[in-house]
From Swiss-Prot:
GO cellular component: host cell mitochondrial outer membrane; membrane
Catalytic site: D699
Protein name, as recorded: RNA-directed RNA polymerase
UniProt cross-references to CDD domains, sorted A to Z: ps-ssRNAv_Nodaviridae_RdRp (cd23173)
This protein's record includes keyword RNA-binding: no
Region (Capping) location: 105-291
Cofactor: Mn(2+)
Organism: Nodamura virus (strain Mag115) (NoV)
Lineage: Viruses, Riboviria, Orthornavirae, Kitrinoviricota, Magsaviricetes
Class of enzymatic activity (EC top level): transferase
Subcellular location(s) per record: Host mitochondrion outer membrane
Domain called RdRp catalytic: residue spans: 588-713
Amino acid sequence: MLNYETIINGASSALNIVSRALGYRVPLAKSLALVAGSCVVYKIIVHRRTLVAFLVIGPYATVVQHRLPMALQRAIIEYTREDREISLFPQNSIVSAEHARKADNGHPISGGTRDVARETISLAIRAAGFRHYEISPARQSPAEAASHQHYAAADLVRAATEDKIQDGDVVVAIDIDYYLRDIDRYLGRGVPFMAYTFNPVEVAGRDGDSFFRITNNQVTFDVSGGGSWSHEVWDWCAFGEFIETRDASWLAWFARAVGLTKSQIHKVHYCRPWPQSPHRALVWCLPVASYWRFTFIPTDLHTRTLRRVRYQDTSRPGWNSIVSTGSEGLNISLGREGADHCVTIPKVHYDMLMGLSSAQSLSSRMIGLKYTDPSVLATVAQYYQGKNVEVADADRIGRAINPKVHWPAHVEVDEAEVSARVYASPLVSDENMMPMIKRWETLSLSLDRRVTFQRNPKVPGKRLRAYAIEFVDLVVPERGVGVPYSLEDTAAMLDKPSQTLAIQQVWETVDMPPRRLIEAFVKNEPTMKAGRIISSFADMRFLLRFSSYTLAFRDQVLHAEHNRHWFCPGLTPEQIATKVVDYVSGVEEPSEGDFSNFDGTVSEWLQRHVMNAVYLRYFNHRAQRDLRSYTDMLVSCPARAKRFGFAYDAGVGVKSGSPTTCDLNTVCNGFLQYCSIRMTHPELTPIDAFRLIGLAFGDDSLFERRFAKNYAKVSAEVGMVLKIERFDPAQGITFLARVYPDPYTSTTSFQDPLRTWRKLHLTTRDPTIPLATAAIDRVEGYLVTDGLSPLTGAYCRMVKRVYEAGGAEDAAKRRSRKSHSREKPYWLTVGGAWPQDVKDVDLMFQCAAARTGVDLETLRSLDQRLGEITDVWADITINRDNEPNPYKDTLDLEGPADGRVDDRVFQNDKHVMRLRANQVTSSQAGAAGSGDASNDPNAHDRGSQRQQGSASVLRVPDRAAPAGVSSDEQPAHQTASRSSASRGGAGPGRGGRRRPGPPAKTTAGGARDGNQARAPTSGPSKRQAEGRSRSSRGPAGSRGRGK
């Protein structure tokens, strides 16, 4: 056995011989490194087979020309290699293939995909038991450690930090790997690396809702609502599964000075799981091994190093090209540098086409290969000729942020139509939607959800019937003494400009009987479900004459001393706030009453025996004949769609356009409270129970907690749904959508935060009014009523400050418009501002945090940031995607918003829509005669009253219905066939296409004797009708593609 000294001396001599043979003049440092490396020879000698493996060339070719250097490289790799293999399967954690943000920030699809990628990566890391280490994490990132400095404005939401990367970490890069100047700094730590990255398979185009192009091998990515980013791209998706990086430790850095380096080997995996963003990839690099090697001796290990992707075409200057693998083989994408257009064709076609001798041959072959798109033919021909033109680099304007649209599943339209605009980024991600009020299917859905499905036929038991008599007598102590106001006095009280104009139009015929007709439309306001119905009475005579009773009753009875303690309509905000504090301070524990669809669930019994009964008891017998006819119209009245003309059953519920709505809803609310008091304390006299009624304003109420159980029980007995909210001091108490953080001692209140934040960024002003003007006018009102409210006040100040600095119209010009106050808060226009005390600001913040679930520090930070922002489109949206979905009866980008699909409900909605469509078209045909009427249910919106006016009158006549048909029934007209209509029931210019051919004829005549349809006297044969029905497509049989 040789001793160690002999081995060292022999090794040194051998190295000198090798150096001279190779022509190396090895410096002392390198000689020492080689000598140190040769120390392993002692161990090798006793392992002959290993020594042979190092010296033989082996079955494959080697990159080292001499055996001894080859053996030394192999030896140091062998004895320093370290197995670092780790298993990680992020594909098991992919949460969604398609996702879009709830809030439209200009790029909801791209942003939503990034959110899903971030969640997928985080879930995969946590599931495998690793620590999440992220480079430049976003505000919503769940990273436990980070490398974070301030490069972009969005980085300022986190403090700068540089945590140490440790074993057990996974380094994460979300859409930022392109900017890393030294990728080895992270991969060289020998830990897993995961990235959500952009790696396009085309040289220009669209990714999600953003566009990109490539110039000089740099991708320019334009993001609406974001920035324009320019960067190179790493070749994560190139061939070669193993990548080699230099170790990032200090020892390896010093060792490189003497010719040694430590290498880290990672295996690269990637997938593209997001169809809406085909150019995005989820990349994960898992460590496999590490080893030391000599830097000056080549190695036989086959790995690759990361490099930047080269898009410039080597054979065509000014052009880009990239080859990718598709489901049917290789594809090549071709496009000019800096252009937004590119074409993608199979690589085998490209190889064949580029070998042709002339451009004419190329065009002929492409046509033979079934290429018919002129843009493809022209682009490939230009590429073949090598034609290069300068691409114009014009300034670009991003897509405007649009309101979120309430989109019922059965709406047959391709593009949304809403009458609203967004003037700033929303405060919360679950913002309000806007209804498509110009679509008749929207009205049909609202009628079903808010009228038809809410019918309440219940009659309460004997006890409640007795309480009703007591309550009416207590509200109106004296019977038959009331006298209505004169019409002149009433007209003076109805002083809104629209009311004044309408009264002037009917004043000369005011003595004529009013027309029995309700016209319904969907209110153009933010919503979370089917839009609210406004049931307006078409004849101003009815409103004027009925108001003479309702206004007198309010002034003389409801505002009388005995009703003042519970009846709140007509009070100013300061009076209401004082009343809330007085009431809460005087009871043991207050509670809130929250009715579900109050108007729709009011029964006929409640209308006749409680709500209308107080009017009829008060006014004298001379006035009762007219008054009874008016109150009867509140219960039963013909109705039609104002914009579209189809008839519907308005039901017996409260009609929102009636002059009694607020007052009688309050009376109904007070009655339910009275009944609950009588049931809880039957020993009380009626007058004592009446004095215990809480605060009531429409369907809002504040009531003692001790009556809550019977309050809910009474509501259920009369067919209404009541939810009682128990008072939580941390969340304050709510009345009239105002939150009182300390109702025992302070009148300070602020608008319900979540309800306000969801709609604060929207305006429904006329689109001809400049957006800046509409925005300032809207927020000025909030600054008066809620200037100190958490976030609301700061947001409104930010909007006003930014738009005024941007050159908005001056105040005098803005206030000269008649619609200047159209979007001012209601209370500002009728009674002034709600009281707010500066000393209660902190309390309001704490209360808002408790009510919304948003961290208090987050609210304070955002409120402060709003005071510094200079861009209304800055990213300020609070992410609430983890909260329960608040939307109903609508589609979003991922399907039904609530995640459920009930085919029965969908088919029923379609069926009702078809019935109403046939009703409209058949009545139009009956009125117009020989088939020249429009078959478009939306025709009323396009000035077609001339054609349809007579049909509308016949459908809903003024006179009473004949025996056997109640006046509130709306029988459908009979039709022999479905009439042809535009796609989705919409005419040209509204998302539909006009079908060729004449409109189908119907045999329905005009209605007579009320709303009963007249049977046809003659018509086509059964065979003709069936044939015509098969050949036509009305809204009932429309096959237009939905959303």
